[in-house]
Regions:
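Short hydrophobic/aromatic helix or loop-helix immediately within or flanking a transmembrane segment
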Residues: 57-92
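Membrane-embedded glycan-lipid processing machinery
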Residues: 59, 63, 97-104, 133, ...
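Transmembrane-helix motifs of polytopic, lipid-linked glycan transferases
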Residues: 92, 96-120
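Hydrophobic, aromatic-rich transmembrane alpha-helices
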Residues: 110-111, 265-291, 298-302, 327
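Short helix- or helix-capping micro-motifs
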Residues: 127-136, 176-180
Length: 358
């Protein structure tokens, strides 16, 4: 019993640290977010309308219902408790309500990420560093401080990979019908459990089929609320086709423009280099302690596919955090290892090169 209490206390303390760090990096983004000039976050106006019960918007955003719905509940709780002048300082009740919901979701993402990294055998300090890298990303800060729905999307990703790693089919099966409603881009990640041998694929398959039934039922219901006859149909397939048509243009904009490079760099900044070093270490067998599960590698084509479908490369690339951050930690751990000089990174690299040149 004492061990269980110790684990609860430890996780609680870790979550408090995560809450504090997340507040520190995201609050200024929330406080100074300009609703009149969203600068690339134009979907925020749709979510604001939805949180106020207006789903008659001519946009594919209207089906991402969970965060706007929760925001409306938080608004009803906050409004009578906080004086209007204080709410005005927070940017108004709408902004404050969105921030509470998104702040909680990204903090929970950080907690699940910590547990995920611990399962991969990273020690508590490295695991917490991985959480800080995620929460400190410019894209995560935007997802927390701005009125958008990506926070639940990132939480859904880490929930899926965590329960795949722990081989918890039952929990995955229960949560999948909810996770599928977070954002349409979560759908490819819902197929990751099929690449884990220990997952009960029949049980999860039933859950996934049920999830798609729920997915299309919710979308059909929301479509029926629109007074515009043109908007009564679910545009999901048209949206995918239109994105595919602009795929080549998106590739040029993402990988061959200053704006695209900025979007790539802003996701993990200098930690991209550490991640590449971690990949190299694993490829050269210099890292044999940390083993990255094979199913995580399927995240790479999923994420790359998103950069083809969307010009917002930063928000798409952050989806790769469950595989980028572990490799980043492998690289950082190797560089800052406190082992003896005989096992120092540079010495090992020189030894390997000498061996290859023989």
């Amino acid at each position: 019993m004492q061990t269980k209490y110790q684990k609860v206390i430890k996780i609680s303390l870790i979550f408090i640290i995560i809450l504090g760090f997340n507040y520190g990096v995201s609050f200024q983004q929330f406080l100074h977010y300009d609703w009149a000039d969203p600068r690339g976050l134009s979907d925020s106006s749709s979510y604001l309308a939805m949180s106020n019960g207006d789903y008659a918007i001519s946009s594919g955003h209207r089906y991402r219902v969970i965060i706007p719905f929760l925001t409306s509940l938080v608004r009803d709780l906050v409004q009578p408790l906080v004086p209007p002048e204080q709410l005005h300082w927070f940017g108004g009740v709408d902004a404050f309500s969105f921030y509470i919901v998104n702040y909680l979701f990204t903090s929970l993402t950080g907690l699940f990420l910590y547990c995920f990294l611990a399962q991969l055998k990273f020690d508590p300090k490295l695991s917490l560093l991985g959480v800080f890298i995620f929460l400190g990303s410019r894209i995560t800060i935007l997802a927390t401080g701005a009125p958008i729905v990506d926070s639940l999307y990132f939480l859904s990703i880490i929930i899926i990979v965590y329960f795949c790693l722990t081989q918890n089919t039952t929990t995955l099966a229960i949560l999948t019908p909810i996770l599928i409603l977070s954002k349409e881009t979560i759908i490819p990640f819902l197929f990751l459990p099929f690449f884990v041998k220990q997952i009960n694929r029949k049980l999860f398959g039933v859950s996934l089929i049920t999830s798609f039934v729920v997915f299309f039922w919710v979308r059909d219901t929301i479509s029926s609320w629109s007074p515009n006859q043109m908007e009564n149909n679910d545009p999901i397939f048209n949206v995918v086709v239109n994105h595919l048509k602009s795929g080549f243009e998106n590739i040029i904009q993402t990988y061959f423009s200053m704006g695209g490079w900025h979007g790539i760099f802003s996701t993990f900044s200098i930690f991209w280099i550490a991640a590449a070093f971690g990949v190299w270490l694993s490829f050269k067998k210099l890292n044999t302690f940390y083993q990255i599960p094979n199913f995580l590698f399927f995240i790479i084509p999923i994420t790359f596919g998103f950069t083809v479908l969307s010009s917002n490369v930063g928000r798409m690339l952050l989806s790769s955090f469950p595989i980028v951050i572990p490799y980043t930690l492998i690289g950082i751990n190797y560089l800052f290892s406190t082992k003896s000089s005989d096992h120092s990174p540079l010495k090992n690299i020189r030894t390997l090169d000498a061996h290859e040149n023989k």
